[in-house]
Amino acid sequence: MITLTERQSLILKAIVRDYTEGGNPVGSKSLVQELPIKVSSATIRNEMARLEDLGLIVKTHLSSGRIPSIKGYRYYVDHILKPEKVDGKDLKVIQHSLGGEFHKIDEIVAQSADILSQLTSYTTFTLRPELKDSRLSGFRLVPLGNHQVMAILVTNNGDVENQTFTIPSDITGDELEPVVRFIDDQLVGLPLQDVLRQLTHEIPLKLAQYLQDPDGFLDIFGSVLSKAASERFYVGGKLNLFNYTDQQSPKELQSLYSLLDQTDRLANVIGPPGQRIQVRIGNEITNDLLKNYSLITATYDVDQHGQGVIALLGPTAMPYSRMIGLMGAFQRELARKLLDYYRYFDE
């Protein structure tokens, strides 16, 4: 385990700060003016050599200065960093943007990704709270003509999912009415995950009492139910990611952009809700496409309604102190807004 002296920590902190703010390698002469302690340029050079031996900073080919390594960023985040207090203007932007009127949780969560992206200029992700508390509160089939129906599913927290389907020509509206009544009588009030589990066995057996071949209806009901129960990732600032891709080939860039549209792969990258703000740097992210990036994730808690995740993806040379402070403030404001929303439905 690496242990730095106070002076070495101050030098590493200054190198990280200068490089993330200016993007240029940092030399000993500039550090002489910046450090809060009086020390000679020669002493700083010696300490920088020690930091380089430890693998915390590296020399570039274009300059005599040094830049932080992935290992250096990791040490800085774990042992030196103190989150900045969020700027008052940024806090007002968050509160104002989340202070509007929203009709669905997804609208709040989607808006959050856009707000966070605008504040950071990075690519951001928001995952809505877990759906363990979501229950089925209603289901309807609306005939549209030409053997088409719209399936509408409503949950207890106000979410509405709808999809249009073509039903087999041998199934009539009269045959579907008792099926919808069965769902209202037997399934309304159950958690969505319980209803999904019953789709594999119990529900098909019971629907066979009403339909000769229930498969067509099961496809309809299962599709809209799965959509309502699925994880929802929202992405803000997709194009921001390409501001930090100098070392990647066109093929890698295409794969990277494609990744942002794949919920399952995003879920693996971002991970489940945790206990605190987490920072993963370079190879710590479970996807080779993101080896030159850093990912900051924060879990927000909405009491019995579960937990969600906010995340931002940017270059390894990001201002971690400001970003972590901002994520903490955003985490609190989003949780407060969602608690207000849930309180309305709980009443």
Curated annotation (Swiss-Prot):
It comes from the Bacteria. Transmembrane segments: none annotated. Gene3D superfamilies: 3.30.450.40, Heat-inducible transcription repressor hrca homolog, domain 3, Winged helix-like DNA-binding domain superfamily/Winged helix DNA-binding domain. GO terms for biological process: negative regulation of DNA-templated transcription. GO terms for molecular function: DNA binding. Keywords: Repressor, Stress response, Transcription, Transcription regulation. Pfam families: HrcA, HrcA_DNA-bdg. Negative regulator of class I heat shock genes (grpE-dnaK-dnaJ and groELS operons). Prevents heat-shock induction of these operons. Belongs to the HrcA family. This is Heat-inducible transcription repressor HrcA. It comes from Lactiplantibacillus plantarum (strain ATCC BAA-793 / NCIMB 8826 / WCFS1).
